Regions:
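Metal-ion/cofactor- or nucleotide/acyl-coenzyme-handling active-site neighborhoods
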Residues: 2-220
Length: 220
């Protein structure tokens, strides 16, 4: 039914309907997204990064298997963004990424303790705040949604998730003023196939990321 309507309606109409539905669905979230103490503190923290790295370059590190064929030691002294479970690689690397980002609620729910313990600035989706008992000094919550400005110029307001944390990391990077942003390990190639946005439980090793344990057995 949904796909049928999309095939017969003009794109502007589809976008209008989608944006209207998302706006209605978001209404109950709006007060907390701007007035909750954690979000107020987060907005102040995020603003401090605006143009902090003006004119510099950074690397956004994906989590694809190609990382195993990449000499990541060259990034030791570079500014970098890591995402989701990239921290599984930190002990082997001998260093961390400069920043960390995650917006996937299931990932954050299952890894909240590990994420909170990371000794680097962390940017997480506001809808995941319920998985934390306190707001660490190096954590900031982003107000993300599924519609909105395609590329935000102000990361303290509402931003578009773009269906991938990589898109959020890109917006953060340019908000921070980086002039050159290089992506590595963003493979866009998955061995496993399935329906989008469907929750499944892993039954074995993960072939789609740099580590078999990334979404290993039992991970949702």
């Amino acid at each position: 039914m949904k796909q049928g309507l999309k095939s017969i309606l003009p794109d502007p109409v589809v976008r209008f309907v989608r944006n209207s539905y998302d706006a209605i669905r978001r209404l109950p979230q709006v007060p907390d997204a701007y007035l909750h103490p954690w979000r107020r503190r987060s907005r102040i923290r995020i603003a401090q990064y605006h143009n902090l790295h003006r004119g510099q370059r950074c690397f956004i590190i994906g989590n694809g298997p190609s990382l195993r064929d990449t000499d990541l030691s060259k990034l030791r002294n570079e500014f970098s963004f890591g995402m989701n479970r990239i921290y599984l690689l930190f002990p082997e690397l001998g260093f961390t990424t400069t920043y960390f980002a995650s917006i996937n609620d299931l990932v954050i729910e299952q890894c909240a303790g590990e994420i909170a313990a990371l000794p680097i600035p962390k940017f997480l989706a506001w809808h995941s705040n319920r998985h934390f008992q306190r707001l660490p000094d190096d954590m900031a919550f982003l107000y993300t949604s599924y519609t909105g400005p395609r590329f935000a110029h102000d990361m303290t307001g509402r931003i578009w998730e773009g269906a991938t944390v990589t898109n959020v990391a890109l917006q953060l990077a340019f908000y921070m003023g980086f002039q050159q942003v290089i992506l590595i390990g963003v493979d866009h190639n998955f061995t496993s196939q399935g329906d989008a946005n469907k929750t499944v439980v892993s039954t074995g090793e993960d072939p789609n990321h740099f580590s078999p344990a990334y979404f290993g057995k039992g991970f949702r």
